[in-house]
């Protein structure tokens, strides 16, 4: 089984970098675990579809702005996310990217889980995360490791 952990975000937008930070820490902890790739991505849309191709399972890690409590860590499925109408394919959302990949015959993952960290601000240029989001990094790492253990049929976190 091939599993991808993909941290998403923009390192210049403060809280939006949380997915990248979590992925980097997960990578450090999983150096010797076969079958699990940990990567980071600053783009979305069709690029996201390409990155997921060929994996059996994918765990995405990203900041979310839903009006919840900053720093809250949640597990979501693609169906939990709203679809968006965009003017170009470059802005395609995750649910649409998965559908399009399957329609094109790409080997898309059978399961995608999103570990979402509620952000305070993803539109402000800053190099550091807000305190609540920075404090959520370790709980998000733990959530990713638990998700990987579940996907691999193991007890507890990897």
Report residues per predicted region:
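Nucleotide and nucleotide-moiety/phosphate-recognizing core
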Residues: 2-6, 11-83
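Residue-level signal for pocket-adjacent positions within structured domains
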Residues: 7-8, 68-71, 87, 117, ...
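Short alpha-helix boundary/capping segments
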Residues: 14, 85, 89, 128-132, ...
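Conserved active-site and cofactor/substrate-binding residues in soluble primary-metabolism enzymes
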Residues: 17, 21, 43, 68, ...
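Phosphate-binding/catalytic loops
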Residues: 97-158
């Amino acid at each position: 089984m091939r599993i991808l952990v993909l941290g998403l975000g923009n390192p210049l937008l403060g809280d939006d970098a949380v997915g990248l930070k979590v992925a980097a820490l997960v990578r450090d902890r999983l150096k010797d675990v076969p079958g699990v790739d940990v990567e980071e991505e600053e783009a979305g849309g069709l690029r996201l579809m390409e990155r997921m191709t060929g994996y059996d399972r994918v765990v995405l890690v990203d900041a979310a702005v839903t009006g919840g409590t900053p720093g809250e860590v949640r597990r979501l499925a693609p169906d939990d996310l709203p679809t968006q109408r965009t003017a170009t394919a470059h802005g395609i959302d995750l649910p649409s990217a998965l559908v399009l990949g399957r329609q094109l015959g790409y080997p898309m993952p059978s399961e995608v889980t999103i570990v979402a960290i509620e952000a305070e601000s993803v539109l402000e240029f800053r190099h550091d995360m807000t305190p609540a989001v920075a404090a959520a990094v370790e709980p998000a790492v733990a959530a990713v490791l638990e998700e990987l253990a579940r996907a691999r049929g193991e007890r507890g976190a990897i």
